[in-house]
């Protein structure tokens, strides 16, 4: 195998320079508020945290499960301004992005991922105020007015349901309060970073309170497009949230909120390199440049790549202006009734009803070859792109039966509708009985690829100037396009229960179970087009005139539709040994946890349903994970030290993995062989997680986080469909889990008291990541293979922050630098299906 690569490099805000942030906090000026503003960051980081991981509010240190929680105040102290930045402080959690802007990748304990196609789901999920976010699209939220984020590791199938086999990220917003409060944050940084956030909390009466927040966050980007002469990779995000709380008495609380956000970002920058010679043969794959264009086109392309690399890490020559636009609205209603005393034979009873709605519109255009040639681009144009609409309902009832027994029961319903495109071509095609020719203009997903020359093997080199003009190409509309539409409908129902029983002061038992039924349906239509006749936007791509027939679809596209129902029961059990306080120990526990989770089944999009051979491969079943975990949680030295640690083993079965199917006759489209997905593998995941927080000396604070994970296939073998009796074994291949084997994060700070009562607190944070083979993303890199061009050696980043707090006044100022040693490391690297392998580096 060849380890040659092409490169996409990414850095974060700081580039080794010092940035400046100013936080102005205005409050009602009560004595309590003043005391909180003057507290040290160490006290903030050791504050008791209340979480709702078991669907009721409990202390973090009382939860018999692996969970990390970070409050809004703690995020401010640690310099966390976006949800994805939290993963640096949480072992075995990876929050990053895919190769396209605003496409999130959530991976917990080696399970998860992210891809924009609405058909695909992944094993680690995200919730926003109780609403499940089923798609990876939308980008990570900023931390504007966030109460806390909870990161739950391990299967959460009992209380949260499907698609959280690795774990989940639970985001909780701040609720309106009865006292006036307000805050403003201004954050300035290099590369045009300008963030402004504001919040005001207003009590309208003794029973009605309102909370309003807004944010504008801008960033110019750190890539330079030397072909177009512009910066790229920039971001422009604006959001507004309004929340109202009505508390007519001690029994009732009614919350209503709405969040509207608009993101107008560039797509992620990148770089190609003259390193790879054996990329997959698809689109403009290695060798296809010369077959489809002219003798020498391949070397000309790599010469351009070399010129970009020589110009610097953050230089590329894309011929297109790319974008990633996301419009998002979330509306939520919560009604809670509290018995405020006995309810018949029960006590402390609570009924909680939640309803939520989310609408997300996504349009993008990405140049995947990063060169001045129109080799490979993908996008939705600027009209009907991808729309994801979801709504959900949940009803919870919890109560105490007696001093020893507590329970929670509930039911939920979730509905998702997702469209990639307007469905015009699909509807016309079906309306004509899938046989007559259809002419339509669609606005779904489009690809622009290297064209085929139908008349000869090689194009005359003298035509090269006409095919690949050297002048910048701002207009899209590259050659050889094809496109597709995808429609997805999901309906999910769940019934669940959880019980906690205290045998005595020392021992506690928790048991629970959930039944989930998931109804899924999808339509997929992929087609070739005959031209690019109507310009949608002169800076992006154009609309294609589509002439679709049954022969054309079978020959070079796909038409399929399928529906399936998947149901599972996911139990859990934990046994907790509570420890008595002693000379050093303030509180503590040991626990054993068994839990299960399942990832719902799915569909192979690139199969023609109207061909008999395609039927058996249209769908595949759920994945299942069983988790065995032993952990410890405790407080020492009068609460000045906190320790949370666990060891886990997860049995991962029925994994949805790809297998190769020979396609000489083109039944499965134009690729040969074609990769399809089925339940074909199993693996074992084991690891350790350790989190230590301590104020070991007056004014000082230390945090230490360690994560270790071992993720290997137990079996990944299957019979070769083209050669019965021949077994293809991939068991010794690496797993693309986007997680290093080991990670360590160490932070140290000390508060120095200045004359007059002011203070200054320097903070140093070191993060070490073990080596990682990103070539595993392609799914075909053996463990014993030489290091690929996508291999990431172990590396260390160092962040610094200095915070000034005055003796009086509700404000503070911080100067900070990220990656002050200017370390370069890979954010993402994969084999593109065209000409090369590309990677993304970060240099924060």
Where are these regions (language model features)?
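Solvent-exposed loop segments that connect transmembrane elements
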Residues: 222-231, 268-317, 367-383, 423-485, ...
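Structural signature of Gram-negative outer-membrane beta-barrels, strongest in the C-terminal barrel
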Residues: 245-247, 397-400, 406, 410-414, ...
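Membrane-embedded beta-barrel scaffold of Gram-negative outer-membrane proteins
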Residues: 332-338, 343, 348-368, 578-606, ...
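Gram-negative outer-membrane beta-barrel transporters
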Residues: 398-403, 407-408, 412, 505-509, ...
């Amino acid at each position: 195998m060849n380890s040659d690569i092409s490169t996409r490099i990414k850095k974060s805000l700081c580039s080794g320079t010092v940035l400046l942030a100013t936080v102005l906090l205005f409050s009602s000026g009560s004595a309590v508020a003043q005391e909180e503003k003057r507290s040290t960051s160490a006290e903030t980081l050791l504050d008791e945290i209340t979480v709702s991981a078991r669907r009721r509010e409990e202390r973090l240190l009382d939860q018999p499960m692996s969970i990390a929680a970070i409050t809004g105040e703690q995020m401010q102290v640690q310099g966390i301004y976006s949800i994805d930045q939290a993963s640096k402080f949480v072992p075995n959690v990876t929050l990053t992005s895919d190769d396209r802007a605003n496409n999130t990748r959530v991976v917990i304990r080696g399970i998860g991922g992210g891809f924009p196609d609405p058909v695909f789901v992944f094993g680690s999920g995200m919730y926003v105020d109780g609403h499940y976010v089923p798609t990876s699209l939308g980008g990570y939220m900023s931390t504007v007015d966030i109460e806390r984020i909870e990161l739950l590791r391990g299967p959460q199938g009992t209380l949260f349901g499907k698609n959280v086999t690795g774990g989940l990220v639970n985001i909780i917003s701040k609720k309106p309060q009865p006292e006036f409060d307000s805050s403003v944050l201004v954050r300035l940084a290099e590369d045009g970073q300008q963030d402004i956030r504001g919040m005001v909390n207003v009590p309208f009466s003794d029973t009605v309170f309102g909370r309003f927040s807004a944010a504008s966050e801008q960033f110019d980007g750190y890539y330079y497009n030397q072909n177009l002469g512009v910066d790229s990779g920039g971001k422009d995000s604006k959001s507004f949230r309004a929340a109202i709380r009505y508390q007519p008495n001690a029994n009732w609380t009614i919350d209503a909120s709405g969040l509207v956000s608009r993101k107008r970002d560039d797509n992620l920058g990148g770089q190609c390199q003259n390193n790879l010679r054996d990329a997959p043969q698809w689109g403009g794959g290695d060798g296809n440049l010369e077959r489809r264009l002219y003798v020498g086109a391949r070397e000309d392309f790599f010469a351009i790549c070399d010129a970009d690399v020589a110009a610097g890490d953050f230089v590329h020559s894309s011929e297109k202006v790319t974008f990633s636009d996301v419009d998002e609205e979330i509306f939520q209603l919560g009604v809670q009734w509290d018995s405020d005393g006995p309810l018949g034979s029960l006590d402390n009873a609570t009924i909680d009803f939640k309803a939520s709605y989310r609408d997300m519109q996504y349009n993008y255009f990405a140049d995947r070859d990063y060169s001045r040639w129109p080799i490979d681009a993908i996008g939705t144009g600027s009209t009907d792109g991808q729309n994801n609409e979801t709504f959900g309902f949940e009803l919870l009832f919890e109560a105490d039966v007696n001093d020893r027994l507590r329970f929670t029961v509930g039911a939920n319903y979730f509905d998702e509708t997702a469209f990639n495109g307007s469905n015009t071509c699909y509807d016309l095609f079906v309306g004509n009985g899938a046989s007559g020719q259809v002419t339509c203009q669609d606005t779904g997903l489009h690809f622009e690829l290297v064209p085929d020359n139908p008349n000869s093997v090689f194009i005359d080199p003298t035509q090269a100037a006409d095919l690949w003009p050297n002048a910048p190409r701002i207009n899209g509309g590259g050659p050889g396009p094809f496109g597709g539409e995808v429609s997805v409908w999901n309906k999910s129902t769940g019934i669940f229960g959880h019980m906690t029983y205290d045998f005595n002061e020392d021992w506690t038992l928790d048991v629970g179970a959930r039944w989930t039924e998931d109804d899924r349906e999808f339509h997929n239509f992929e087609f070739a087009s005959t031209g690019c006749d109507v310009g949608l936007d002169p800076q992006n791509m154009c609309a294609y005139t589509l002439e679709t027939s049954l022969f054309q679809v079978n020959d070079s596209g796909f038409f399929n539709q399928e529906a399936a129902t998947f149901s599972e029961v996911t139990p859990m059990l934990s046994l907790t040994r509570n420890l008595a306080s002693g000379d050093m120990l303030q509180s503590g526990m040991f626990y054993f946890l068994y839990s299960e989770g399942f990832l719902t089944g799915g569909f192979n999009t690139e199969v023609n349903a109207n061909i008999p051979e395609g039927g058996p491969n249209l769908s595949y079943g759920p994945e299942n994970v069983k988790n065995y975990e032993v952990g410890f949680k405790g407080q020492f030295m009068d609460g000045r030290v906190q320790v949370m640690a666990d060891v886990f083993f997860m049995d991962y079965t029925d994994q949805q993995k790809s297998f190769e199917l020979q396609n000489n006759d083109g039944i499965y489209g134009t690729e040969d062989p074609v990769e399809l997905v089925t339940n074909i593998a199993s693996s074992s995941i084991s690891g350790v997680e350790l989190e230590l927080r301590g104020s070991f000396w007056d004014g000082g604070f230390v945090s230490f986080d360690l994560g270790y994970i071992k993720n290997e296939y137990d079996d990944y073998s299957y019979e070769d469909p083209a050669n019965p009796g021949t077994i293809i074994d991939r068991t010794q291949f690496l797993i693309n889990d986007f997680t290093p084997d080991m990670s360590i994060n160490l932070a140290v700070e000390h508060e120095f008291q200045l004359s007059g009562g002011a203070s200054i607190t320097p903070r140093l944070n070191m993060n070490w990541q073990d080596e990682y083979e990103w070539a595993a993303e392609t799914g075909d890199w053996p463990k014993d293979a030489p290091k690929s061009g996508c291999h990431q050696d172990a590396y260390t980043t160092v962040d610094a922050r200095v915070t000034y707090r005055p003796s009086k006044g509700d404000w503070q100022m911080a100067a900070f630098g990220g990656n002050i040693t200017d370390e370069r490391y890979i954010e993402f690297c994969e084999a593109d299906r065209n000409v090369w392998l590309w990677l993304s580096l970060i240099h924060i």
